[in-house]
Amino acid sequence: ELVSNASDALDKLR
C-alpha cells in the first residue's frame, strides 16, 4: 500500500 501511495505521489509530481 505504501509503495502504491508513493508511486501515485511521484506520478502526480511528474
UniProtKB/Swiss-Prot annotation:
GO terms for molecular function: ATP binding. Molecular chaperone. Has ATPase activity. The keyword ATP-binding applies. Keywords: ATP-binding, Chaperone, Nucleotide-binding, Stress response. Belongs to the heat shock protein 90 family. This is Putative heat shock protein 1.
